[in-house]
Amino acid sequence: MANTPSAKKAARKIERRTAVNRARRSRVRTYLRKLEDALTAGNKDAAVAAFKAAEPEIMRAVTKGVLHKNTASRKVSRLAARVRKISA
């Protein structure tokens, strides 16, 4: 348990940031789930649309510090390859 006033404030801030980051991470996962559903269904148009929506959301998570840059790039690259494969 935090004892000093600054430690108590830090604990409050961490709690708020954790809630925000959890929401951001959840939002990214939702977009990825929609894309995954479109890919497994084999729906080309839905997959392309879902990818166009998911890619900026993933990169936004990077700028907000939720995902690491390389992790996001790897995810986007692999998803783009899968979308390209279904489109061909």
Swiss-Prot record:
InterPro entries: Ribosomal_bS20, Ribosomal_bS20_sf. Gene3D superfamilies: Ribosomal protein S20 (1.20.58.110). GO terms for biological process: translation. SUPFAM superfamilies: Ribosomal protein S20. Keywords: Ribonucleoprotein, Ribosomal protein, RNA-binding, rRNA-binding. GO terms for molecular function: small ribosomal subunit rRNA binding; structural constituent of ribosome. Residues 1-25 are annotated as: Disordered. It comes from the Bacteria. GO terms for cellular component: cytosol; small ribosomal subunit. Pfam families: Ribosomal_S20p. Binds directly to 16S ribosomal RNA. Belongs to the bacterial ribosomal protein bS20 family. This is Small ribosomal subunit protein bS20. It comes from Azorhizobium caulinodans (strain ATCC 43989 / DSM 5975 / JCM 20966 / LMG 6465 / NBRC 14845 / NCIMB 13405 / ORS 571). The gene is rpsT.
